[in-house]
Amino acid sequence: MKPRILVIDDDSAILELVAVNLEMSGYDVRKAEDGIKGQALAVQLVPDLIMLDLMLPRVDGFTVCQRLRRDERTAEIPVLMLTALGQTQDKVEGFNAGADDYLTKPFEVEEMLARVRALLRRTDRIPHAARHSEILSYGPLTLIPERFEAIWFNRTVKLTHLEFELLHCLLQRHGQTVAPSEILKEVWGYDPDDDIETIRVHIRHLRTKLEPDPRHPRYIKTVYGAGYCLELPAETELHQHADQFPSAS
């Protein structure tokens, strides 16, 4: 069965351009021209991926994305946001709303197709060999792939697909600085020239879930000019850190 993609964009020229190229690449494409219709179609069809313009009539893309993430029927569908704005704050707001990746208009068709393939691969909407199947653990952190969960100081933390992949990437290289280009290639599946803000927003989300004080991270550290490093205490040191977290209920 062909992967199904829902494209939501009020620009009819862009909508047709995207749809034609996706169909030529073997995808089943459905279309909507405003946020309300797009959200309704997403719930009805439960597509494999949603391409969502941010500046939509009736209901904007930010709101649509938030609603999709709150609905259990659509919460796990990868969302590729489309924006003509290209400003950092708009990208940040899109990621905060729950988008997985973004394309700034105008974009090259090949770049669009590459990002679509990467999102589908990463969420197992099409087969790939890189799926994590084994539990990974060090010190207070254990990652459980089948449920996209982390056990963190004996507490269960639910992660999005992206958060899980990002944390897995850092945990595999525990104690090492991981460059942004390496993170993008492994987690997002592509290697753009400059996409640091994408990583920064998702690192912030991880810190909110794992750090006792996200503004002063103790475990997920920024190595300025070089990348990010996950530093975890060994088993023998856990008692020195456990008091930062409330007792599990």
Curated annotation (Swiss-Prot):
It comes from Synechococcus elongatus (strain ATCC 33912 / PCC 7942 / FACHB-805) (Anacystis nidulans R2). Interacts with SasA and CikA. Response regulator of 2 two-component regulatory systems SasA/RpaA and CikA/RpaA involved in genome-wide circadian gene expression. The histidine kinases have opposing effects modulated by the clock oscillator proteins; SasA phosphorylates RpaA (stimulated by fully phosphorylated KaiC) while CikA dephosphorylates phospho-RpaA (stimulated by the phospho-Ser-431-KaiC-KaiB complex). A very robust clock is reconstituted with KaiA, KaiB, KaiC, SasA, CikA and RpaA; output is measured by transcription from an appropriate reporter. Phospho-RpaA (but not unphosphorylated protein) has a large regulon. It binds about 110 sites on the chromosome (regulating about 134 transcripts) in a circadian manner with maximal occupancy 4 hours prior to (subjective) dusk; among its targets are global transcriptional regulators, cell division regulators, certain clock genes (kaiBC and rpaA), and genes involved in metabolism and translation. Activates transcription of subjective dusk targets and represses transcription of subjective dawn targets. Also responsible for cell division gating (cells elongate in the night but do not divide). Disruption phenotype: Loss of circadian control of gene expression; KaiA and SasA protein levels are unaffected, KaiC is constitutively phosphorylated. No growth after 24 days in a light/dark regime. Loss of circadian gene regulation, cells arrest growth in a dawn-like state. Severely attenuated growth after 5-7 days in a light/dark regime, glycogen degradation rate is normal for 2 hours in dark, terminates at a higher than wild-type level. The gene is rpaA. PANTHER family: DNA-BINDING DUAL MASTER TRANSCRIPTIONAL REGULATOR RPAA, REGULATOR OF RPOS. It comes from the Bacteria. This is DNA-binding dual master transcriptional regulator RpaA. Residues 133-232 bind DNA. Residues 4-120 form the Response regulatory domain. Negatively regulated by LabA, mainly during the dark.
